[in-house]
A protein has these predicted regions:
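Short, acidic loop-to-helix structural element flanking the phosphoryl-transfer center
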Residues: 5-8, 26-52, 59-64, 81-89, ...
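Single conserved hydrophobic/aromatic residue that forms the stacking wall/gate
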Residues: 184-187, 191-192
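Non-catalytic pre-domain segments flanking phosphatase-related domains
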Residues: 1-20
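Glycine- and acidic-residue-enriched helix-capping/strand-helix junction motifs
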Residues: 174-183
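Structural motif
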Residues: 19-21, 134-139, 165
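Active-site phosphate-binding/coordination module
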Residues: 44-122
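Short acidic low-complexity segments
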Residues: 5-11, 118-133
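Short, well-ordered secondary-structure micro-motifs within conserved domains or adaptor modules
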Residues: 126-146
Length: 192
């Protein structure tokens, strides 16, 4: 029979560490869930470690700044692991080449700053789709635009067998209302 867990404190003593999804568990994209934050603070007071995980394309430091804006205090977690940092490791080790066509918003340029855990990161050059070896996507150019705006770029990339690195596998993001996100954009390529 399945045991229903009503609160973290019922089971937390069984674990040395928690890996907790951010979006929908700790915050809703606008504000923190107070009960979740309080539960994590209490868990840490009792010696537990908390790693917040997210498929945000942002580097850890960017997510930590965003968390403060959502009223998620640093005292409720030890560190943050992001898909953005994982994708940056892949990019700076050459997975998609050195000449990159970038799909994303200008605010995501921090993605292209070398990550400290890579000793000798390759030099990345952002180029047009015609001159690219690979495509890196942190999100649509415009989150409110129809995903088909990138269709021609995807078709060109497919025709040249370019590698595609998607830093955020979300199809949609819910911030009070649904809006397009990364994989919705790459799904446009699947339809081709």
């Amino acid at each position: 029979m399945t045991h229903i867990i009503n609160s973290l404190d019922e089971i937390s003593h069984h674990y040395d560490a928690l890996f907790v999804d951010l979006w929908g568990c700790v915050h809703n994209g606008i504000v923190a869930y107070t009960a979740a934050v309080e539960a994590l603070i209490e868990y840490r007071k009792n010696g537990g470690k908390v790693v917040l995980v997210t498929n945000s394309p942002k580097p850890r430091i960017g997510v930590e700044k965003q968390l403060l804006h959502f009223n998620v205090p640093k005292i409720c977690y030890d560190t943050v692991a992001t898909s953005g940092d994982s994708a940056r490791v892949a990019m700076f080790t050459g997975v998609v080449g050195k000449k990159i066509f970038f799909i994303g918003e200008p605010r995501d340029q921090l993605f292209f700053e070398p990550i400290s855990i890579i000793k000798s990161p390759i030099k990345i050059e952002q180029v047009s789709i015609q001159n690219a070896e690979g495509i890196v996507c942190t999100g649509p150019f415009d989150g409110s635009a129809d995903p088909s705006v990138n269709k021609e770029d995807f078709l060109f990339g497919i025709s040249k067998s370019m590698k595609f690195l998607c830093a955020n596998p979300d199809i949609v993001v819910d911030r009070g209302e649904v809006r397009h996100c990364l994989l919705y954009t790459s799904d446009a390529a699947d339809e081709c």
